[in-house]
Amino acid sequence: MKRPREPSGSDSESDGPIDVGREGELSQMARPLSTPSPSQMQARKKRRGIIEKRRRDRINSSLSELRRLVPTAFEKQGSSKLEKAEVLQMTVDHLKMLHATGGTGFFDARALAVDFRSIGFRECLTEVIRYLGVLEGPSSRADPVRIRLLSHLNSYAAEMEPSPTPPGPLAFPAWPWSFFHSCPGLSAPSNQLAILGRVPGPMLPNASSLAYPIPGLRAAPLRRAAGTILPARRNLLPSRGASSTRRARPLERPAAPLPAAPSGRATRGSHMAPLLRSPSPVSPGMVGSPAYMAVPAPRPSSPGLAGRPAGAMLCRSWVSEITEVGAF
């Protein structure tokens, strides 16, 4: 089929008719040679789904790393599940805080691992304190073994603390003893802390080491007792009896004679009589609070004790008793 060409503006151009069928062939050659088959379309959709799944996995993995690296997100991880927007917001806040405090923006892997270890140790210590408080009940008398155990764990937590020494004094309360203020049903914190100053022994820290565990703020390192933490059985019973008697008296009581001891302690008084006759020098490590100086008065039936002064006899008897039963 041929059609006549439209007349052009110039009469000098005279071309023949144009073949329409040949134009159709040229247009088909310009198109793609073949359309995609259904199997090819299905394979393309499958590849696209795999790529999308890998992208989501990378996003979730990065969010998990942010939950572990950002301190605020790590603390809230156990309470409830954090959303992605919350994790990103906490990350932004943490980076702003680092920028405001002059941080470099890089994480020290070793310091981060030590910090996580100290956080876990403090959580375990808090759980131990809670369990021992519930197990002992609301009584005002605390076990000396429990006091020594908590003092040892507190000193070990102080050694693990990676934070540097601040220039000024601490502005926050002592830890972990502030746990007693927030837990109802436990014994009074004043009784717990007062017992710490009355229980003698090499494992008892001083007042400066009971503060928040920062190594630079402690006056001297804690001396560890040779052997196990718990005392031997032969020293446990008299020490517990002596410590329970000392806990029953207030700290402010002066060194004065008390009424006669009950009949249950007669054997113990007769056992201590040879030690009372021999003078023993007072070591500087044994000097304690005035509660250590209050002892039962000697009975008139004891021979050989009437001719000695009352003050010297009280001091020497108490020091000899501590020397025999051993510092708990």
From Swiss-Prot:
Region Transcriptional repression and interaction with NCOR1 and SIN3A, annotated ranges: 42-111
UniProt record, GO biological process: Notch signaling pathway; regulation of DNA-templated transcription; regulation of neurogenesis
Residue ranges constituting the Orange domain according to the UniProt record: 116-153
One MF term in the entry's GO annotations: protein dimerization activity
Region of interest (Disordered), ranges: 1-54, 236-272
SUPFAM superfamilies: HLH, helix-loop-helix DNA-binding domain, Orange domain-like
Recorded GO CC terms: nucleus
Keywords: Developmental protein, DNA-binding, Notch signaling pathway, Nucleus, Repressor, Transcription, Transcription regulation
PROSITE patterns found in the cross-reference section: BHLH, ORANGE
Residue intervals of the bHLH domain: 43-98
Main location, first listed in the record: nucleus
InterPro entries documented for this protein: bHLH_dom (IPR011598), HES_HEY (IPR050370), HLH_DNA-bd_sf (IPR036638), Orange_dom (IPR003650)
Pfam families noted in UniProt: Hairy_orange (PF07527), HLH (PF00010)
Localization, UniProt: Nucleus
Subunit structure: Self-associates. Interacts with GATA4, GATA6, HES1, HEY1 and HEY2. Interacts with HDAC1, NCOR1 and SIN3A.
Role of this protein: Downstream effector of Notch signaling which may be required for cardiovascular development. Transcriptional repressor which binds preferentially to the canonical E box sequence 5'-CACGTG-3'. Represses transcription by the cardiac transcriptional activators GATA4 and GATA6.
PANTHER family: BASIC HELIX-LOOP-HELIX TRANSCRIPTION FACTOR, HES-RELATED (PTHR10985)
Family membership: Belongs to the HEY family.
Protein name: Hairy/enhancer-of-split related with YRPW motif-like protein
UniProt organism field: Bos taurus
